[in-house]
């Protein structure tokens, strides 16, 4: 297990030096443990660049180690043998908009009462499943309804996304109305190159391709909304964040009645784990309180 723990630390920290600091051993000891594990398995497990990252084989070993660690942590908890400080670490993949809205409410009870340390990895809702596939997380929030092998897929609910803009932005870029021609000259905000919501909205309602309009990339939900309020861009905003901005008059919906309904699902390892069950129960319960039911939206926006 020491060799597996060393591999996990190196991949998570991105370097042998930081892994050594985390494990409270020398850098050479960490390097030796990883090398011994590679020799034992006959596979290269990490690519020794900066930052260090796992090979495909390393990802599979890491996934196996994390599953074992989760079950071991549960056993220790049952025997009152958590780590030295009494915490259990849990890695989850989540999209930025969920993290800014309903997701913290879902986890607050468990984090406080189960003494969990959360390691949240933020990705677009179309891309979080890759984190699960690579073994980086035990579960993820995703817009895909397709369960991966060895995992469960639990429906959570739907988030409506609406294209919002300020009055100043509309006056500058859309003086003659919201048209496809005007969109081709107007800057649009996107979270990252993986964010496809703007592309889908413009393709679905205006027939505009993904490279036919200027865009800002803003990898922060808060800054994303701020750019829109300042009149520097328009963009797809989840209803929970957008509704107060609309009510205050800071922004308005560009095309009322035209929106994207993004479904969310909880994908998690299919383990006989009390922690996995409790996580799932908390997420489902909070989603029922804060997200829309699936049957409210006849057309859902799945990854393409």
PLM features per residue range, with description:
Residues 8-24:
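Short helix-boundary/capping micro-motifs
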Residues 13, 22, 36-44:
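Residue cluster at the C-terminal edge of the helix-turn-helix DNA-binding motif
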Residues 26, 33-36:
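Residues within the DNA-recognition helix of helix-turn-helix
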Residues 38-56:
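A short LG(V/I)-centered, amphipathic sequence patch enriched
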Residues 40-41, 61-83, 283, 290:
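Alpha-helical linker/hinge and terminal dimerization helices associated
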Residues 85-149:
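Central regulatory/effector-binding core of bacterial HTH transcription factors
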Residues 153-232, 246-259, 289-304:
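C-terminal regulatory
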Residues 256-300:
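A late-sequence structural motif
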